[in-house]
Curated annotation (Swiss-Prot):
Pfam families: Pribosyltran
Protein name in UniProt: Bifunctional protein PyrR
Species in which this protein is naturally found: Alkaliphilus oremlandii (strain OhILAs)
Alphabetic keyword roster: Glycosyltransferase, RNA-binding, Transcription, Transcription regulation, Transcription termination, Transferase
Family: Belongs to the purine/pyrimidine phosphoribosyltransferase family. PyrR subfamily.
Lineage: Bacteria, Bacillati, Bacillota, Clostridia, Peptostreptococcales
């Protein structure tokens, strides 16, 4: 039987996202010209939750976009060379805006690199920041998150599993 430990429960995730929302507002001096872009799959509902929290705190709407990085990944195996692409959906102009990429886990940095490539194909933001729910270390690329919900140092053999209610039916972060 596989041993797993719960790192964050629903209330822990909620507190982490509330703190990240406050940090985003503090660092950017409000929400003007801020756009949240969720990296498919679990980054999208996290970006939506951050937008709701920012609206509650600041009283203003923040645009949310969806980024599908499938075609930009450099770690696809030969079996995955024909990936199913669902498309990005960034309906607002990101030029000269502060774009915050949102993802569930930061590990090697390869997903973030692919997201950066996809984003610059859409436009030229003034600045790009990164918000992640969990940073587990083990970078292969020089990438650092601006906003981190929880740092969870892991071994390379361990797995962080983020469950999001909108996708998985419940909210938790597990270490396996």
């Amino acid at each position: 039987m596989e041993k797993q430990v719960q790192i964050l429960d629903e209330s822990g995730i909620n507190r982490a996202l509330t703190r990240i929302a406050h940090e985003i507002l503090e660092k950017n001096k409000g929400s003007k010209d801020v756009i949240l872009v969720g990296i498919k799959t679990r980054g999208v509902p996290l970006a939506n939750r951050l937008a709701e929290k920012i609206k509650t705190i600041e009283g203003s709407e923040v645009a949310v976009g969806i980024l599908d990085i499938t075609l930009y990944r450099d770690d696809l195996t030969k079996e995955q060379l024909d990936p199913v692409v669902h498309g990005s959906d960034v309906k607002v102009d990101i030029n000269e805006k502060t774009v915050i990429l949102v993802d569930d886990v930061l590990y090697t940095g390869r997903t973030t690199r692919a997201a950066l490539d996809a984003l610059v194909d859409i436009g030229r933001p003034k600045v790009i920041q990164l918000a992640v729910l969990v940073d587990r270390g083990h970078r292969e690329l020089p990438i650092r998150a601006d906003y981190v919900g929880k740092n969870v140092p892991t071994s390379k053999e361990e797995i962080i599993k983020v469950q999001i209610k909108e996708i998985d039916g419940n909210n938790s972060v597990l270490l396996k």
